[in-house]
Amino acid sequence: EALETAVVENPLKDAYFGETHVHTSFSMDAFIGGARITPDEAYKLAQGADVVVNGQKHNIGRPLDWVAVSDHAEFIGEMYSTQVPGAKGGDNPMLEELRNLKSVDEQRAWFLKYVVENNRGENPGHPPFYAGPETTRSAWKDVQIKAAIDNYRPGKFTTLAGYEWTAAPKAGNMHRNVIFRDLNVPDMPFSALDSADEEKLWAWMAEQEKKGSRLLAIPHNSNGSKGLMFEPLDNAGKPITADYARLRSHFERLIEMMQIKGNSEVHRKFWPADEFAGFENADSVGSFSGREFKKEYFVRWAATKGLDYQAKLGANPYQFGF
């Protein structure tokens, strides 16, 4: 707090540039794909330092002002066992196989079996090489949170503790990055293995608020959600109510519209009069897992639908910042 009070704020405000969706080697999908940058190294890279990964030097060029490393919560315990010397479960032969994946075919097979098929199944769970909740706790506190603390430079570079809740019911992406405003964080993240129901995520977030946490969830990839992101029914199959709208808008004040899986704001097929609607449409995402795009998958549609809810319910579940 003493450090923070020494920071001079501009009363006219400043523009800051950062990132809330960063994956490192502690995300299983990234590790399978060859990522070996740690959370600590990711923060250093964001600040402009040279970082050597897989034998190659990398530099971001222009440093960022703030970053949240948001690795997938679902398998960070497994990745802790995989990478931290002496960690519980690290000698599991399956993890030795994971550490030594070579070909694209081997990587694809691991990704489909332990990430895609598991996460999108009826009952997602930990793989057989999970060594228990203490590894998840260690990955969260000793790696993720520690990296955020160690790289925080008040007034110069802001780190934000966070993680990704990676639910994919019915193969529809319902992913959210959960970001904490300070270090009043839980001992364990709430992952999609605890529940793939976003309403239960919000209930958990409400419990954290009661304990003093300040947090929000940032949805992304609505284009790949199969319509679930902006569905007119709650998870009990009932029409959205004012209470639902208020709860959602309380915790989900922002939405991520652009990332590697494409643009979730708009699509040229549905807004042909918009000359910029063809940017990063990522049609390949629409052809994967039966996710043929519909207008209702996109943020622009949700923004207008939210006005309807405001008129009918007195509350808007889709009043997002972009």
Predicted regions and their residues:
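Extended, charged catalytic domains and RNA/DNA-binding interfaces, predominantly
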Residues: 1-322
